[in-house]
Amino acid sequence: MRLNGAPYNNAELKRIAGYVMQSDLLNGCLTVEETLMYTARLRLPRTFTNAERKQRVDEVMADLGLSHVHDVIVGTPLKKGISGGERKRVCVGMQLLNRPQLLFLDEPTSGLDSVTALDLLRTFHVLAHGKSEAKAVTIVCSIHQPQAKIFNLFDSLIVLKAGSIIYQGPRKQAMVGISISFLNCSILIPFSFLSYT
C-alpha cells in the first residue's frame, strides 16, 4: 500500500488526514466558536498565536456556513442549540482546522433530512474543488443509497454490494459499468435498485 507515492506510513497518514465519525461527540454547553477555538488550541501547532487560531477558526466557520451561528450553543437534549446539519458541519470544521489533504467521513448524511444532506454535500463539493490550492481537500465518504442530486456531486465512486466491489471509477461512467450486472437500473435514483440484505 502506498500513500502519496511512498510506502504507507501511519504517522504520515495522521499528519495529512482527518476523520469525522458518524455520531458526533460535542460538548453541548459550548458555542460553535468556543468548540472550534478549543479544538484549535489542542490541534494547531504551538507556534500559532491566539490571533492566528482565531483567524483559522473564522475561516473554517465561513467555509462551512457557520458564521451566523458562531455564538449559538451546540445544544443538549434539554437545551436547544444548533441544527443537526450544523452539528455535522462543526464536526467537519474541527478536522479542517489542520487543513488536511485528505478527509474521511463516515455516513455524513446520517440522521439529516434530504435538503440538509444535499446542502452539506454541496459544501463538501466546494471544499473538494477548493477555493485555493492551500484549502483543497480530497474527501472520501461512505454513503448508503444517495439521492440522485447527491450522487451527481461525486467525482469518483467505489460501489459495494455484499462486501464486494461492483464498480470503481468515475461517477459519470458508473451507470454503464453497473448496468452490465443489473438490468433493472433506475436512472433517477442511481443506486436505489441495489439490495443491501
Regions found by a protein language model. Name each.
Residues 117-135:
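Helical segment within the ABC ATPase nucleotide-binding domain
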Residues 15-19, 23, 28-45, 56-59:
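Q-loop/switch helix immediately C-terminal to the Walker
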Residues 37, 52-73:
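Conserved ABC ATPase "signature" region
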Residues 91-93, 120:
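Hydrophobic anchor residue at the start of the ABC signature
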Residues 96-101:
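A short, proline-enriched helix->beta-strand linker immediately N-terminal to the Walker B motif
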Residues 103-107:
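Catalytic Walker B motif of ABC-type/P-loop ATPase nucleotide-binding domains
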Residues 1-7, 13-15, 75-77:
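Conserved ABC transporter NBD signature motif
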